[in-house]
């Protein structure tokens, strides 16, 4: 008797239940010229009654074997649950004419998505949401608890809302296989349009909600193609607008933060590419912003220096985050008035450059860099003063908001955020000098982080951050331009935000 047989015999004696044994059904399988016998190929057929019976037997055995631990299991569950604040809410985020936020309620399994109308066009101060009290004018956008009724499993797999706040495109998974079924709902009437997009990977609206772009999945769950749908027409008439033939790459689609482009992002572990199409011509052809290069990752977002041109005109910007010239990434800002597509990596003004030291391809940047310690101080004439001499410098993203700019980077293995006013950034950009960032250090990070802070203490720290931004604005000749209006940047996705693929979206 071998060890497995002895263990099974012991379990059968102790529990009175035989350990389920999967039957062997030999099947030859050949790959790359090699043939082997797979005795359990039959288990792949999820619809087979034999498979269902075997899984049920395994479940019965597990339940009986684990029965003595039922009390401990409940104790652990209750302990974990006691550390969770069940009745809670998220920080409101403004999108177009509404503040959106999420509520969770004690005793309910799922969250509820809510919103309230903004008070005015200049309302950038998020409302104070109380856990147990609805706000004036509060609307339920999506109650997952109601939607989940009658399903053994339910997951909300994405939500996009039209610019006028009337239409919602949402996806649900009721099988647990991460293939989502998307529908379009009228938020004013609750009625749903007849078209359905079943078993897909994700979807997005155009700003006017007249078009839907969605991603197809192959048999391996790889998102590989993008389809275009005209709202109000049969799904059978949908058009394929992009297909990724290379199985190493996945595909995503979304809307750019400036809402002027539909973005297709495609990438592998080491290579990415972004394709764009103007929302003014949704039936047009997607074009690569920068053609794909092997082992080069990049992302792009768009912003604008309003009124900063010589004659008071706006300066449209493309903000490119890439590792084509530096293994620890860099950020380039392109003046789109003076550059034309197809763009090239390395065009524009270099705003922040990471350290090549200790990196595999560091020698491409500086001879001998790859053999140097990763913590060697690094300086680059393009970098802001606060980055000069940084140890282990890595650039992680930039966000150009309505009134200020935030730079995210890593030094000495720790994350950092630096800020400056947008007006000062425009001056530095046009003058061709390093940008004058100042590091932003919240009070909670200066000493011990108290996780039991009261709401008043948190508000005090928040006010302190605004004060630092005010001081920064004053130092850069902007008076108090940041105070009161820059708060939007902490709660919404205006302008360019942290870089991520595939295809950044505003939702």
Where does each model-flagged region fall?
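Beta-propeller folds
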Residues: 1-507
């Amino acid at each position: 008797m071998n060890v497995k047989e002895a263990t099974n015999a012991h379990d059968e004696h102790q529990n009175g239940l035989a350990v389920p044994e999967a039957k062997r059904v030999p099947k030859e399988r050949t790959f790359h010229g090699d043939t082997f016998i797979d005795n359990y190929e039959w288990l792949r057929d999820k619809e087979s009654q034999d498979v269902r019976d075997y899984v049920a037997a395994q479940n019965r055995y597990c339940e009986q074997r684990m029965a003595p631990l039922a009390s401990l299991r409940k104790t652990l569950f209750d302990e974990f649950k006691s550390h969770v604040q069940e009745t809670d809410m998220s920080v409101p985020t403004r999108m177009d004419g509404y503040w959106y936020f999420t509520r969770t309620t004690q005793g309910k399994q799922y969250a509820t998505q809510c919103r309230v109308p903004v008070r005015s066009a200049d309302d950038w101060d998020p409302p104070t949401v109380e856990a147990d009290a609805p706000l004036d004018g509060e609307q339920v956008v999506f109650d997952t608890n109601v939607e989940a009724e009658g399903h053994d499993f339910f997951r909300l797999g994405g939500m996009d809302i039209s610019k006028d706040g009337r239409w919602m495109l949402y996806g649900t998974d009721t099988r647990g296989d991460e293939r989502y079924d998307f529908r379009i709902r009228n938020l004013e009437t609750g009625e749903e349009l007849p078209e359905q997009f079943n078993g897909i990977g994700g979807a997005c609206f155009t700003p006017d909600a007249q078009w839907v772009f969605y991603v197809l999945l192959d048999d391996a769950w790889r998102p590989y193609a993008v389809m275009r749908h005209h709202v109000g027409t049969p799904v059978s008439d949908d058009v394929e607008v992009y297909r990724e033939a290379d199985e190493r790459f996945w595909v995503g689609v979304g809307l750019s933060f400036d809402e002027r482009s539909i973005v297709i992002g495609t990438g592998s572990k080491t290579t990415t590419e972004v394709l764009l199409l103007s929302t003014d011509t949704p039936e047009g052809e997607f074009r690569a912003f920068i053609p794909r290069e092997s082992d080069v990752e990049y992302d792009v977002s768009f912003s604008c220096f309003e009124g900063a041109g010589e004659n008071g005109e706006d300066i449209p910007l493309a903000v490119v985050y890439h590792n084509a010239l530096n293994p620890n990434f860099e950020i380039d800002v392109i003046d789109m008035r003076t550059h034309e597509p197809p763009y090239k990596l390395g065009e524009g003004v270099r705003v922040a450059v990471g350290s090549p030291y200790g990196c595999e391809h560091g020698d491409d940047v500086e001879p001998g860099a790859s053999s140097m310690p990763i913590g060697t101080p690094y300086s680059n004439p393009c970098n802001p003063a606060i980055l000069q001499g940084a140890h282990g410098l890595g650039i992680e993203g930039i966000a150009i908001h309505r009134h200020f700019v935030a730079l995210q980077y890593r030094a000495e293995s720790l994350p950092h955020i630096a800020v400056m006013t947008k007006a000062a950034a425009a001056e530095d950009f046009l003058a061709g000098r390093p940008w004058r960032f100042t590091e932003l250090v919240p009070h909670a990070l200066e000493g011990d982080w108290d996780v039991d802070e009261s709401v008043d203490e948190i508000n005090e720290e928040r006010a302190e951050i605004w004060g630092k931004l005010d001081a920064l604005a004053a130092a850069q000749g902007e008076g108090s331009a940041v105070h009161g209006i820059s708060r939007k940047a902490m709660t919404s996705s205006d302008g360019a935000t942290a870089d991520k693929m595939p295809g950044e979206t505003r939702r």
